[in-house]
C-alpha cells in the first residue's frame, strides 16, 4: 500500500503532538522516526471516523543491530528503513494516544502478514517514562 506523503506527515505530526512520549521530539527525531519511514513506506496510520488514532513504523535489522538497539547502543538510521531483507522485523514507533493500542497492534500484525506474506515476529523496544 502506497501512502500519501503530505497526509502521512500531517497526521503523523498530529499523533506525535498528542503523545506524551513523542511531543517533545526534536527535528532530528521527527526525521528519523516519522519522515524517513514515510519516505520508505515503513509507516501505517490508522483512522477512526476520519481522524488519525494511531501509527506504527518499522524497519528490518540484523540480529546484531537489533540487540544493540535493544540495549540502547544503536540509533535507527535512514538506511534501516530501506531494506526488508535483514533478519529481524522491528516495530520502531507505536503511537495510540487515544487508548487504541490493542486495535493498532492487531491491525499491524495483519498488515505485516499481507505485506511480507508471512506471519513475522515483531520485535519491540519498550521505552521508559518520558
Model-identified regions with their sequence ranges:
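Short linear motifs in intrinsically disordered
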Residues: 4, 32-36, 112-116
Amino acid at each position: 500500500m502506497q501512502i500519501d506523503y503530505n497526509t502521512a506527515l500531517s497526521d503523523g505530526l498530529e499523533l506525535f503532538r498528542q503523545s506524551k512520549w513523542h511531543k517533545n521530539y526534536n527535528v532530528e527525531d521527527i526525521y528519523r522516526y516519522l519522515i524517513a519511514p514515510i519516505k520508505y513506506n515503513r509507516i501505517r496510520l490508522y483512522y477512526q471516523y476520519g481522524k488519525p488514532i494511531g501509527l506504527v513504523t518499522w524497519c528490518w535489522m540484523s540480529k546484531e543491530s537489533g540487540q544493540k538497539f535493544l540495549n540502547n547502543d544503536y540509533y535507527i538510521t535512514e538506511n534501516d528503513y530501506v531494506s526488508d531483507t535483514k533478519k529481524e522485523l522491528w516495530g520502531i514507533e507505536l503511537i495510540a494516544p487515544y487508548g487504541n493500542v490493542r486495535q493498532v497492534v492487531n491491525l499491524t500484525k495483519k498488515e505485516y502478514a499481507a505485506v511480507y506474506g508471512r506471519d513475522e515476529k515483531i520485535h519491540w523496544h519498550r521505552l521508559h517514562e518520558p
